[in-house]
Swiss-Prot record:
<dbReference type="GO" id="GO:0008652">
    <property type="term" value="P:amino acid biosynthetic process"/>
</dbReference>
<comment type="pathway">
    <text>Metabolic intermediate biosynthesis; chorismate biosynthesis; chorismate from D-erythrose 4-phosphate and phosphoenolpyruvate: step 7/7.</text>
</comment>
<feature type="binding site">
    <location>
        <position position="45"/>
    </location>
    <ligand>
        <name>NADP(+)</name>
    </ligand>
</feature>
<keyword id="KW-0028">Amino-acid biosynthesis</keyword>
<keyword id="KW-0285">Flavoprotein</keyword>
<dbReference type="GO" id="GO:0009073">
    <property type="term" value="P:aromatic amino acid family biosynthetic process"/>
</dbReference>
<protein>
    <recommendedName>
        <fullName>Chorismate synthase</fullName>
        <ecNumber>4.2.3.5</ecNumber>
    </recommendedName>
</protein>
<comment type="similarity">
    <text>Belongs to the chorismate synthase family.</text>
</comment>
<comment type="function">
    <text>This reaction introduces a second double bond into the aromatic ring system.</text>
</comment>
<feature type="binding site">
    <location>
        <begin position="130"/>
        <end position="132"/>
    </location>
    <ligand>
        <name>FMN</name>
    </ligand>
</feature>
<dbReference type="InterPro" id="IPR020541">
    <property type="entry name" value="Chorismate_synthase_CS"/>
</dbReference>
<keyword id="KW-0288">FMN</keyword>
<dbReference type="InterPro" id="IPR000453">
    <property type="entry name" value="Chorismate_synth"/>
</dbReference>
<dbReference type="GO" id="GO:0009423">
    <property type="term" value="P:chorismate biosynthetic process"/>
</dbReference>
<dbReference type="Pfam" id="PF01264">
    <property type="entry name" value="Chorismate_synt"/>
</dbReference>
<keyword id="KW-0274">FAD</keyword>
<keyword id="KW-0456">Lyase</keyword>
């Protein structure tokens, strides 16, 4: 199972093509739209979310509500395109139009300058349009398909924010996916402890007034994953490595950890490893889950716990200094539409990206031409594990 995305932030539409989804998976546009709506929510979101109300159109790979094994094409129309039609036109246009919305002042923290240098662009909008977080719309759409597949295999996933701009969010250690959905899933801040919500909203409002932005840390948990996904035999087959790569590929994400993560480096081994236990009804389990569900690059049957660090959004209404690429004179960086924070939305992106990697791994490991075949293969594998 693999996918590609295409489209620019202010272009006519965004597109994703997914190949390798088993035939026979029940799938509707509404399944995907639910996730797209979640991505557009959250406290601190601004202008673009008022313009766009994302709705997916499925144009291939699904017939009469079921996947048919061929590539699935997903399209999301950019409603704001009507205001950018000439500026973003595929055909050549007059020079005066080309100069409209031309970007020559790269924004610190964005791809603008390095992208312009790499591809020899005189207009940095060519970089901005594709490097924009708008692309994550389609990663969420792809993730929605993956989550539907995982649900059929009794694998569930959820996320919540555990640190908001340096402020720790209180939550118990042994959180289930259901716990997260019933708390953070109903919060516009995506936090477990709603008693901290009002203080955080005031904090975000202060940041916005100051023309600044904040980041934070998001935790995603996956339940129902059988032991043995991934492999220790080659570096590129380790599933935690694949998840880590996918998470840091999300716009503005700068770090990732599993279980205790970086805290593990501060403790002796006796306080880090999870002791192995066995029982007649559950088979092999662990006494704790400080390694976040991974050993040797493979799932160990415990809950997968992964955290991603999101830097503050680099587009500031109180812009930092930059250099104009035409004149080489110092200027305050260009300002595009921005939000004080996008942590709750980024959590939705991370959740769907992790779901996609897990679904890919399952489809790679097991026979998966059809959903029936995949269900049988997974059930047979779980039975074998239980007898070990």
């Amino acid at each position: 199972m693999r996918y590609f995305t295409a489209g620019e932030s202010h272009g006519p539409r965004l597109t994703a093509i997914i190949e390798g989804v088993p035939a026979g998976l029940s799938l509707s546009a509404e399944d995907i739209n639910i996730e797209l709506k979640r991505r557009q929510g959250g406290y601190g979101r601004g202008g673009r979310m008022k313009i766009e109300s994302d709705q997916v159109e499925i144009t291939s790979g699904v017939r009469h509500g079921k996947t048919i094994g061929s590539p699935i094409t997903l399209n999301v129309t950019n409603r704001d395109f009507k205001n950018w039609e000439q500026i973003m036109a595929a055909q050549d246009v007059e020079d005066k139009i080309k100069k409209q919305r031309r970007l020559t002042k790269p924004r610190p923290g964005h791809a603008d300058l390095v992208g312009g240098m790499k591809y020899e662009f005189e207009d940095l909008r060519n970089v901005l349009e594709r490097s924009s977080a708008r692309e994550t719309t389609m990663r969420v759409a792809v993730g929605a398909v993956a989550k539907k597949l995982l649900h059929e295999l009794e694998i569930e996933i959820a996320n919540h924010v555990v640190n908001f701009g340096g402020r720790e969010i209180t939550s118990p250690e042994n959180l289930s996916v259901q716990d997260i959905r019933q708390t953070a899933g109903l919060s516009d801040l995506s936090i477990f402890d709603e008693s901290q919500a009002e203080e955080l909203r005031n904090y975000i409002d202060q940041i916005k007034k100051a023309g600044d932005t904040i980041g934070g840390i998001i935790e995603t948990r996956v339940e129902g994953v059988p032991a043995g996904l991934g492999s220790y035999v080659q570096y590129d087959r380790k599933l935690d490595a694949k998840i880590a790569a996918a998470v840091v590929s999300i716009n503005a994400f700068k770090g990732v950890e599993f279980g205790l993560g970086f805290e593990a480096g501060k403790r002796p081994g006796s306080q880090v490893m999870d002791e192995i236990i066995w029982s007649e009804d559950k088979g092999y389990t662990r006494s704790s889950n400080q390694l976040g569900g991974f050993e040797g690059g493979m799932t160990n049957g415990e809950q997968v716990i992964v955290r991603g660090v999101m830097k503050p959004i680099p587009t500031l209404y109180k812009p930092l200094m930059s250099i104009d690429i035409e004149s080489h004179e110092p200027y305050k960086a260009s300002v595009e539409r921005s939000d004080p924070t996008a942590l709750p939305a980024a959590g939705v992106v991370m959740e769907n990206v992790v779901a996609t990697v897990v679904a890919q791994e399952i489809c790679d490991k097991f026979d998966s031409d059809t959903m029936n075949e995949l269900r049988d293969a997974v059930a047979s594998y779980k039975k074998r594990l239980s007898e070990y």
